[in-house]
């Protein structure tokens, strides 16, 4: 167990207070930059600073994380160059989730597969898209594109949109992964609208859920409400859960406007503390190993 202090991008991270399982995977990270090499999309809604592969590796080596999933971030639009180059640097340690559009060819998808991409992302929430019909159309289109490759579809959306997609999801053979607790609000508890649908979809085995970025869904990520919601999910279907840090933690600060043309500071999240919190949510080492290592190995084809 490593007890040395760790600081990455000026953010300190606690030492782990548990034994990290072998082949543990951080299933939700982003890489940004160098900004001179990778132009941002003109349609972005924020401007990130640089967060490079060496920074990510410094974090993961310090926290004993052996594997990583790079999720293509929205400021680059459908230009996956930064994510794909990061995967080339990571080699077998890394997997990726890309963002595509109707112009992406099958040959491009095959090339992405070769460097480690294993899914595509529909980022509805960042774009403020909550239209259920649009979401269903996008879901059907996306799964048709990735099914021949054996990939999954990752969605960033909320509980209401997720619930509206239940019938469509039940017709798919492609796994669907929901980011960030599917934005279930911890303070609303496990009886909040549509939380039962999330549990039902998890029980069906058709969807996966990322226990990632609790600061996005709880006023107090260490509080009783967050703990209750997380433990309910873990007890329900631990073989369909993943953990992700959301490093380097984009997303703006609460109450502050976002700017397209001004570098937005990342949230100073302590990822060592986040991992220790996860370990406290879980009752036993076998379940922790399942969430951190076994499940990612299966979904991301490590």
What would you call each of these model-derived segments?
Residues 28, 60, 83, 112, ...:
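Conserved, mostly hydrophobic/aromatic
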Residues 25, 29-31, 138, 142, ...:
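A generic "structured core" feature
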Residues 4-11, 192-302:
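H/E-rich (His + Asp/Glu) clusters that bind or coordinate divalent metals
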């Amino acid at each position: 167990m490593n007890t040395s202090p760790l600081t990455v991008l000026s953010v300190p991270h606690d030492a782990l207070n548990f034994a990290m399982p072998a082949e543990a995977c951080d299933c939700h990270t982003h890489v940004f930059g160098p900004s001179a090499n990778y132009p941002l999309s003109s349609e972005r809604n924020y401007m990130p600073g640089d967060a490079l592969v060496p920074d990510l590796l410094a974090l993961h080596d310090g926290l004993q994380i052996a594997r990583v999933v790079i999720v293509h971030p929205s400021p680059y639009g459908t230009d996956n160059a930064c994510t794909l180059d990061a995967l080339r640097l990571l080699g077998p340690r890394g997997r990726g989730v890309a963002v595509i559009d109707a112009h992406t060819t099958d040959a491009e998808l095959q090339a992405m597969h070769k460097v480690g991409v294993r899914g595509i992302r529909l980022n509805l929430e960042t774009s403020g898209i909550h239209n259920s019909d649009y979401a269903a159309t996008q879901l059907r289109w996306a799964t048709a594109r990735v099914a021949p490759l054996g990939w999954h579809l990752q969605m960033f959306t909320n509980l209401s949109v997720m619930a509206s997609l239940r019938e469509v999801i039940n017709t798919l053979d492609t796994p669907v992964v929901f980011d960030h607790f599917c934005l279930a609000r911890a303070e609303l508890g496990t009886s909040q609208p549509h939380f039962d649908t999330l549990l039902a979809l998890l029980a069906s085995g058709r969807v996966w859920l990322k226990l990632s970025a609790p600061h996005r869904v709880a006023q107090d990520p260490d509080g009783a409400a967050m703990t209750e919601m997380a433990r309910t999910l873990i007890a329900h279907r631990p073989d369909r859960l993943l953990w992700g840090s959301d490093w380097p933690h984009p997303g703006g600060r609460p109450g502050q406007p976002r700017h397209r043309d001004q570098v937005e500071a990342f949230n100073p999240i302590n990822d060592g503390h986040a991992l220790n919190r996860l370990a406290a949510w879980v009752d036993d080492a076998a379940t922790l190993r399942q969430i951190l290592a076994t499940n990612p190995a299966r979904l991301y084809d490590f």
